[in-house]
Amino acid sequence: MGLLRIMMPPKLQLLAVVAFAVAMLFLENQIQKLEESRAKLERAIARHEVREIEQRHTMDGPRQDAAVDEEEDIVIIYNRVPKTASTSFTNIAYDLCAKNRYHVLHINTTKNNPVMSLQDQVRFVKNITTWNEMKPGFYHGHISYLDFAKFGVKKKPIYINVIRDPIERLVSYYYFLRFGDDYRPGLRRRKQGDKKTFDECVAEGGSDCAPEKLWLQIPFFCGHSSECWNVGSRWAMDQAKYNLINEYFLVGVTEELEDFIMLLEAALPRFFRGATDLYRTGKKSHLRKTTEKKLPTKQTIAKLQQSDIWKMENEFYEFALEQFQFIRAHAVREKDGDLYILAQNFFYEKIYPKSN
């Protein structure tokens, strides 16, 4: 290459560089078009599958037994926060759905927007509550919490979620955008080609690693109110805490994912029977691993921890962790280094009037 440069006149060298740059831009544009076409095809296939189910429902008539069996009339919503081991957990649900007889559906929003329009909120609530063919149903997607009660529904879905240490989540997401993961290694990522480390980004004050990027887990739990997405809002954090306690069945943490799965299996065996063994022994137990990820230095972590945004997100994480560990402490016992689910610990007595 060096010899060719010496032999080529300067004008030809310039033309060669320009031609190469144009070719690269053209190639990137074609790749982008292919990815957009693939996404459109996936959406078309999904719509076709939904139409087929609805047509079968129309031909066969509505299910008469939908309200009879309470165990079948269950919907779980996992409004998954990005980069919290959500793919690993979701794949357990997919692996168990045929065996445990329930449906799994991915909520695919345009450009992964976690906030739905008002009209889409109405459609979503109606779909979830009346689509009896998909019950029992496990819905998952990157959407913020939606309060079904304000839409007047009689039976609300069961919300679950998993959160992660805020800085670890941001670091994982930073490298994921650049290098992807081992789940779909060939897929081109939005920031592919950017070799800058997370440490370098923080040192330079880059936008992709700014403290504002930490603000995600709080708004996901806070919901669809505008204040939820106001970065650094104390009201948003208080609302997120309220929802976590009052509206979520169980919220686990990435760092203790196996215990989260164990508790779900004990409490909701209709969906999660066999989940713990599958997580421990299955080939998908740690399905998605971000590639090329480099741990940040202590200096980088210390700099992020000076931010009020980190302090709030970390307070919320610690709040969720404390609640999860409280629930676990009352549900399991440790023996020889292993955890065991407690058997039923209540019974009924002094039942009157006495039967003859």
UniProtKB/Swiss-Prot annotation:
Residues on Cytoplasmic side: 1-11
Pfam family, one: Sulfotransfer_2
Post-translational modification: N-glycosylated.
Enzyme class, first EC level, given as a word: transferase
Glycosites: N108, N127
Annotated active site: H140, H142
One BP annotation, GO: heparan sulfate proteoglycan biosynthetic process
Effect of R189A: Severe reduction of catalytic activity but no effect on 3'-phosphoadenylyl sulfate substrate binding
GO molecular function: 3'-phosphoadenosine 5'-phosphosulfate binding; heparan sulfate 2-sulfotransferase activity
Transmembrane portions of the chain: 12-28
Lumenal face residues: 29-356
InterPro entries listed in its UniProt record: Heparan_SO4_2-O-STrfase, P-loop_NTPase, Sulfotransferase
Superkingdom per UniProt: Eukaryota
EC number per UniProt: 2.8.2.-
Main location, first listed in the record: Golgi
Keyword Electron transport part of the UniProt annotation: no
Entry's localization field: Golgi apparatus membrane
GO cellular component assignments: Golgi membrane
Membrane topology: Single-pass type II membrane protein
Family per record: Belongs to the sulfotransferase 3 family.
The protein's role, per its UniProt record: Catalyzes the transfer of a sulfo group from 3'-phospho-5'-adenylyl sulfate (PAPS) to the 2-OH position of iduronic acid (IdoA) or glucuronic acid (GlcA) within the heparan sulfate (HS) chain and participates in HS biosynthesis. Required for metanephric development of kidney formation, suggesting that 2-O-sulfation within HS is essential for signaling between ureteric bud and metanephric mesenchyme.
Matching PANTHER family: HEPARAN SULFATE 2-O-SULFOTRANSFERASE (PTHR12129), HEPARAN SULFATE 2-O-SULFOTRANSFERASE 1 (PTHR12129:SF17)
Protein name: Heparan sulfate 2-O-sulfotransferase 1
Lineage, uppermost ranks: Eukaryota, Metazoa, Chordata, Craniata, Vertebrata
Gene: HS2ST1
